[in-house]
Amino acid sequence: MIAKIIMCVSLFIQSSIEIDRATTYNAEVTQCNSDPLTTADGSRIDLDKLANSQLRWCALSRDLIWDEERQKLHNYDTSVFRGFFRFGDTIVVESISSPQINGKWVVRDCMNKRYKRSIDFLFDPKNNKPKLGVCPDVRIINK
């Protein structure tokens, strides 16, 4: 509990969190798991809303997400699920080089455990998703 309070205070002191790796993904088996339309928090992806840009959902690396239930599953490993954000939180993203990702996104998913300080933006595979590569200037704004 004390660690969570310290992290929250730290976030409020910071004006933003710099992201090391920002990418895009699609709800496909090759990029997710065997049920790509269900996110880590149990939300179902509505492909029609996604196609019409009505869904702005993202996945964060496990070091940025706070989830007590998942901490138990990982034997309270301090490197996972002890971050600043919870599933369902709305975050504000800013990027100078990729303005199409600027704005509000809802945290609904988490990334593979090999990623740290990373964000993955969900886009419709039929639409032209932005080609981010590894975007160097993405940050989550504390507003």
Which functions belong to the PLM regions below?
Residues M1-C8:
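Sec-dependent signal peptide recognition
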Residues I13-K143:
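Solvent-exposed, well-ordered loop and adjacent helix/strand elements within mature globular domains
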